[in-house]
């Protein structure tokens, strides 16, 4: 080959993953492409995998040896790379040291986050560690002014302090940071070796001056990397924007170092090579523009671009609106199954983006592809616990890996596929074993499955159930894994109003081909598409990607004719600026195209939709069309607001060469070999094995069959048919109905796990509907709601992760309506209730219940409970601290049909809530709850139609029985581990701040594996509002039991089956009909939980309350609960600044709160030292100070202000809480635990929340017992 032909001819597309680096290189001469795969880390053989891969390919093409450390770039035209370098550094916490600079009072804001805990039943709360090393608080603050009254006050008193932010909002500068102070503070940390800085000030998304000042000084000092939050993503919400700036400061220096080390191994002409990197949004950027916060999805993004541009399946031509025939591509679900997890995404002509995602405990604001991840992959571990097949979320990793890797690993999905004959060891390279020179070990996998099957069969035998073979066990885990992977697919289709069955499944990634047919069958999809390079599609997709500039600015305009010229001018200016950047890089104008977007939402809601500029420029019509499709209704009478203006400018990527393979000769195909494989419908049968490289365009293969390539194994299930497409050689699998094993009503542990996933998936999708369709901050942002499924008698079946106080007591509400209404509950009717005597908790928690009908009979119930911000009562927020009867707490409803014959009964609802201070929000949120229930009904009916009512009912009861078994085993284990007598009684006592006694007499019967919870020693009903209805006690009980069960089981009615509960009437835990109860739900419930967990020795006391703060007047009401410390336990510390036990609501972001309400949050920080000391230390509480800019009624409803949260086993007590008011004259007043006061303008409330108790004497030895 001539030297001229080689010059600038080779395009390299590289996916550097955590384990392997895949390279697809292409050039305009035979053989036109080369694929290379190598380990991402192999320091004994090379220092950088992508560069080594390039070197190897160049050697093969040029036929000569090339130096490893001075690679010749003569033949290289371009290098495109997607990398997990940033992602892995974030997951492993191996980034740069970072200094965080923020506004005074908010040093711990990013640590507290939204104050929720990730797993509601985890007593030993864990979150990933912080990524900044030190914090500087500066005397800096601005106030956003959106309230007319407050604006007029400022104009009268200090008009010169007002400025305009970039959004158009007025800003009052409260304090300008001092230049000398900034410099001295930054120097302290610079001299300690911190060279990367992240800056986030409150409201800097619209007012940039103070961040720019800090950035300027940091640059003067010599900081090497400076991340200013407003320059990265100027969107409202201080926490995610601040975390984004920290992520950028943490990762960008690492990425820059990686790029430097990568390029230094080439010759001096590397600067002439076009090098670009894949960003999280699916667009490429030049190497010098690649930033840490845009790198998180750099790896998987290439695969999404790859399938979006190569999946060529179409539906039949049809008539469009103009009466013409058109061919339309089917929407596609991307299915990328790897070793530890599976990523799913959706494509329907455009890439779907989201602008706020969470990874490794950090919320990141940036345009990212809407990729949903589930912890199920080839390396997911297999467990059998309490009669349940469980897959993951733990992974065996690459080392030691599955059992078959011969490194003393554990059973994983890969082992199951190997045992079933779906993976063939002879087609894997010999890279396993301790010396990485052995093949996959089938015999080791067989032995491990034999041991697991023996364990499972012991359970089967004990429960008079049929014994299982190793094949059945292995396939059972495959089926459970498939169901787990279906859940996120349902969430991105059905939960958003799309029909799953109308999509094509595009499968890629190393493990996906073994599961794709089953996944498609489960979801009713007609086809699977597998690209010829599916195993390296993330690399291949890089060659199809565009260079992209994506930029946006915040906005606060109403979408109307008056503002049209303003936002269109801003949009056009953004387009021109971005376009000019690409022109400056040498792209011709004809290759550049621009997209404009408005981020729109209804006034008073948080659900914004990014609307691409329609052809007719009618953004409003497009927004409403999308909104109605996704949510099923429109909100009338509300302004449309513009939150952000965005542009996305592309420079079209050069297309890769079209792949071509030979056409089929039409002769019968001869398999490479025959392998015994197991399939559910036919058992273990002879299965033909084909090599993809031997197949031609037009070949067809009937299942069962296996197709093998260098990078993937594809299982074609029975009744499916694989077609090799012309001329590309891509694979299309037509999915047949298949013959699944008939599911009977008899307990099958495999189907038990499958139904557990299905029931929980339905509840999850109900929750997604309620988030998207609700109006109020309480429900939409703080997530103070729950959704669940119930049996025909009202027993809890399954719920989505939610608020424990709701879920445990909702079944009492459903049961009450079942008993009260009976046959008077008709189809098309929806019932509302909130009364504590009807299974309610406290009155603001409104429960909406709907029956699921099948052939004219009620067969299930679905219900949703949401906390409404105001329903009347004597104080705004309907949480009066001093209520003496329920009539003072708001509208009390035993049973009200709010939907009859399918029609919302608005007049009746308005009359019921006539004293609400925000009736429109009540109505909107009730409609959201109705919509969530409707979704639940649809999905339940689909499940019944698929399996039959008898089977679905049977597994409903099996799942409840499974939970019962898990609790019984837990009671038995605790009896043994705590050295109790076979029948033994424990007593746990605590007191409310008013002295009311809460006493549990706990009797555990080891032989029966049961317990009696006797509350007879508790105090009498109080003349106040800390009375707790019986549903609250049952809720605290079911939560505590579930929290002490170590395995993953669904929370349901079965948890209470082993428990006899004794609650005498007339007590604080079983009050009279008219007693006040608002505090019982939010305060006494926490004390009940502390008493139960103390009796079991599970952990010390948490902060013991929810710190309920409300404020408002006759025009508005606001409510929040505030985090504190959790109790330590055996071998774990308590957690700081988090919600505990019976609640898990989020806190409203400070910028959202201040924009909507006339307040200033002065401080939100950790209350250091408030946790109890001990062998294991209790978590610390928080300090929260809010200044009011109008006269308001402010109410606090709290506990643990008199009595400290207790330590356990010699651990010390935590600090009690404190509520203060700071008057305008500078005087502080202690307002006690429960009070309602009229606060004057500019006065503040300061809340110090309690910590959690310590566990064990400080110098003692604590064992697991």
Swiss-Prot record:
UniProt family annotation: Belongs to the oxoprolinase family.
Pfam families recorded: Hydant_A_N, Hydantoinase_A, Hydantoinase_B
Job description of the protein: Catalyzes the cleavage of 5-oxo-L-proline to form L-glutamate coupled to the hydrolysis of ATP to ADP and inorganic phosphate.
GO biological process: glutathione metabolic process
Subunit structure: Homodimer.
Biological classification of the source: Eukaryota, Amoebozoa, Evosea, Eumycetozoa, Dictyostelia
Subcellular location: Cytoplasm, Cytosol
Major place of residence: cytoplasm
InterPro entries noted in UniProt: Hydant_A_N (IPR008040), Hydantoinase_A (IPR002821), Hydantoinase_B (IPR003692), Oxoprolinase-like (IPR045079)
Reaction equation(s) it catalyzes: 5-oxo-L-proline + ATP + 2 H2O = L-glutamate + ADP + phosphate + H(+)
Gene that this sequence comes from: oplah
Protein name per Swiss-Prot or TrEMBL: 5-oxoprolinase
Gene Ontology cellular-component annotations: cytosol
Species whose genome carries this gene: Dictyostelium discoideum (Social amoeba)
A GO term for molecular function: 5-oxoprolinase (ATP-hydrolyzing) activity
PANTHER family linked: 5-OXOPROLINASE, 5-OXOPROLINASE RELATED
EC number: 3.5.2.9
Alphabetized UniProt keyword annotations: ATP-binding, Cytoplasm, Hydrolase, Nucleotide-binding
Disulfide pairings: none
Top-level taxon of the source organism: Eukaryota
């Amino acid at each position: 080959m001539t030297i001229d032909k080689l010059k600038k001819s080779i395009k390299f597309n590289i996916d550097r993953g955590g384990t392997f680096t895949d390279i697809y290189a292409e050039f305009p001469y035979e053989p036109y492409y080369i694929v290379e795969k190598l380990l991402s880390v192999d320091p004994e053989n090379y220092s950088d995998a992508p560069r080594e891969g390039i070197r190897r390919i160049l050697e093969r093409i040029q036929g000569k040896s090339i130096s490893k450390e001075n690679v010749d770039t003569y033949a290289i035209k371009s290098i495109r790379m997607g990398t997990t370098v940033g992602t892995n550094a974030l997951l492993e916490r191996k980034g740069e040291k970072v200094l965080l600079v923020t506004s005074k009072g908010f040093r711990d804001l990013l640590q507290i986050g939204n104050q929720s805990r990730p797993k509601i039943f985890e007593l030993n709360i864990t979150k990933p560690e912080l990524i900044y090393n030190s914090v500087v608080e500066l005397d800096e603050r601005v106030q956003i002014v959106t309230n007319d009254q407050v604006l007029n006050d400022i104009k009268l008193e200090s008009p010169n302090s007002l400025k305009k932010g970039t959004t158009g909002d007025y800003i009052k500068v409260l304090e300008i940071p001092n230049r000398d102070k900034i410099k001295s503070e930054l120097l302290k940390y610079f001299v300690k070796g911190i060279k990367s800085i992240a800056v986030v000030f409150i409201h800097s998304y619209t007012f940039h001056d103070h961040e720019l000042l800090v950035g300027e000084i940091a640059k003067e000092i010599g900081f090497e990397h400076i991340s200013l939050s407003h320059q990265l993503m100027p969107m409202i919400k201080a926490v995610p924007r601040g975390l984004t700036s920290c992520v950028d400061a943490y990762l960008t220096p690492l990425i820059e170092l990686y790029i430097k080390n990568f390029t230094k191994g080439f010759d001096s002409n590397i600067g002439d090579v076009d090098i670009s990197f894949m960003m999280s949004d699916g667009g490429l950027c030049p190497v010098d523009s690649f930033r840490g916060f845009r790198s998180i999805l750099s790896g998987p993004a290439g695969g999404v671009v790859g399938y979006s541009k190569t999946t060529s399946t179409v539906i039949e031509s049809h008539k469009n609106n103009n009466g013409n025939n058109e061919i339309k591509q089917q929407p596609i679900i991307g299915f990328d199954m790897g070793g530890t997890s599976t990523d799913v995404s959706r494509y329907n002509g455009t890439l779907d983006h989201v602008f706020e995602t969470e990874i490794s405990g950090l919320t990141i604001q940036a345009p990212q592809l809407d990729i949903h991840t589930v912890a199920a992959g080839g390396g997911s571990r297999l467990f059998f616990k309490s009669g349940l097949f469980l897959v993951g979320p733990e992974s065996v990793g690459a080392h030691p890996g599955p059992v078959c890797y011969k490194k003393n690993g554990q059973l994983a999905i890969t082992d199951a596929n190997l045992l079933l004959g779906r993976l063939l060891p002879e087609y894997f390279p010999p890279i396993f074993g301790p010396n990485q020179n052995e093949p996959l070990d089938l015999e080791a996998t067989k032995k491990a499955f034999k041991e697991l099957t023996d364990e499972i069969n012991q359970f089967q035998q004990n429960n008079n159930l049929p014994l299982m073979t190793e094949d059945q066990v292995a396939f059972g885990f495959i089926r459970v894994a498939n169901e787990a992977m279906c859940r996120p697919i349902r969430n991105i289709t059905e939960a958003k109003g799309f029909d799953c069955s109308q999509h094509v499944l595009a499968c890629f990634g190393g493990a996906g081909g073994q599961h794709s047919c089953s996944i498609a069958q489960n979801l009713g999809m007609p086809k699977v598409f597998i690209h010829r390079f599916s195993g390296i599609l993330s690399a291949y997709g890089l060659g199809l990607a565009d260079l992209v500039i994506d930029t946006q600015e915040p906005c606060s305009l109403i979408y109307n004719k008056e503002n049209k010229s303003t936002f269109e001018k801003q949009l056009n200016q953004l387009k021109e600026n971005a376009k000019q950047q690409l022109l400056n890089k040498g792209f011709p104008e004809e290759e550049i195209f621009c997209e404009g977007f408005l981020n729109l939402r209804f006034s008073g809601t948080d659900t914004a939709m990014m609307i691409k500029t329609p052809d007719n420029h009618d953004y409003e019509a497009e927004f409403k069309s999308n909104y109605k499709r996704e949510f099923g209704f429109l909100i009338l009478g509300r302004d449309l607001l513009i939150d952000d203006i965005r542009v996305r400018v592309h420079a079209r990527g050069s297309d890769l060469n079209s792949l071509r393979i030979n056409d089929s000769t039409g002769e019968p195909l001869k398999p490479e070999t025959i392998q015994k494989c197991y399939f559910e419908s036919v058992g273990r049968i002879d299965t033909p094995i084909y090599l993809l490289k031997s197949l031609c365009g037009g070949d067809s293969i009937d299942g069962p069959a296996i197709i093998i390539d260098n990078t993937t194994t594809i299982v074609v299930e029975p009744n499916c048919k694989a077609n090799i497409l012309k001329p590309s050689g891509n694979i299309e699998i037509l999915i047949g109905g298949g013959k699944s094993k008939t599911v009977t009503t008899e307990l099958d542990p495999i189907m038990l796990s499958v139904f557990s996933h299905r029931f929980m998936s339905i509840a999850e999708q109900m929750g997604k509907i309620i988030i998207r369709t609700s109006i109020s901050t309480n429900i939409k942002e703080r997530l103070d709601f729950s959704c669940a499924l119930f049996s025909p008698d009202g027993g809890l079946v399954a719920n989505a992760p939610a608020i424990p106080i709701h879920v445990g007591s909702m079944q009492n509400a459903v049961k009450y309506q079942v008993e009260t209404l009976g046959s008077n509950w008709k189809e098309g009717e929806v019932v509302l209730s909130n009364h504590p005597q009807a299974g309610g908790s406290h009155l603001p928690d409104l429960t909406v219940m709907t029956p699921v009908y099948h052939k004219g009979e009620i067969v299930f119930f679905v219900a949703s409970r949401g906390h409404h911000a105001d329903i009347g009562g004597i104080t705004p927020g309907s949480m009066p601290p001093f209520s003496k009867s329920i009539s003072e707490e708001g509208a009390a409803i035993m049973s009200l049909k709010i939907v009859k014959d399918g029609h919302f009964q608005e007049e009746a609802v308005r009359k019921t809530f006539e004293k609400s201070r925000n009736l429109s929000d009540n109505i909107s949120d009730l409609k959201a709850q109705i919509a969530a229930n409707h979704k639940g009904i649809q999905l339940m009916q689909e499940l019944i139609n698929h399996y039959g009512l008898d089977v679905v009912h049977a597994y409903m009861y099996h799942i409840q029985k499974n939970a019962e078994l898990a609790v019984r085993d837990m009671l038995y284990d605790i009896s043994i581990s705590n050295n109790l007598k076979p029948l033994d009684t424990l007593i746990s006592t605590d007191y409310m701040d008013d002295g009311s006694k809460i006493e549990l007499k706990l009797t555990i019967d080891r032989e029966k594996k049961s317990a009696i919870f006797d509350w007879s020693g508790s105090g009498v009903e109080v003349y106040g509002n800390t009375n707790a209805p019986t549903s609250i006690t049952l809720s605290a009980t079911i939560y505590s039991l579930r929290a002490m069960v170590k395995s993953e089981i669904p929370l349901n009615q079965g948890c209470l089956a082993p428990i006899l509960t004794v609650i005498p009437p007339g007590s604080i835990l079983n009050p009279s009909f008219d007693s006040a109860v608002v505090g019982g739900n939010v305060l006494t419930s926490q004390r009940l939980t502390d008493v139960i967990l103390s009796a079991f020795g599970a952990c010390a006391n948490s902060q013991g309350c929810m710190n309920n703060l409300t404020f408002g007047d006759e025009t508005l009401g606001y409510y929040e609960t505030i985090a504190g410390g959790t109790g330590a336990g055996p071998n774990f510390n308590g957690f700081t600044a988090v919600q505990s036990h019976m609640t898990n609501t989020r806190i409203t972001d400070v910028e959202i709160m201040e924009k909507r309400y006339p307040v200033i949050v002065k401080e939100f920080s950790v209350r250091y030292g408030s946790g109890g000391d001990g062998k294991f230390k209790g978590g610390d509480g928080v300090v929260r100070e809010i200044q009011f800019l109008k006269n308001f009624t402010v109410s606090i409803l709290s506990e643990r202000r008199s009595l400290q949260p207790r330590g356990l086993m010699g651990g010390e007590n935590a600090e009690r809480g404190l509520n203060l008011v700071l008057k305008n004259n500078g005087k502080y007043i202690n307002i006690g635990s429960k009070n309602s006061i009229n606060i004057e303008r500019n006065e503040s409330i300061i809340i110090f929340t309690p910590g959690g108790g310590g566990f064990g004497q400080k110098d003692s030895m604590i064992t697991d017992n």
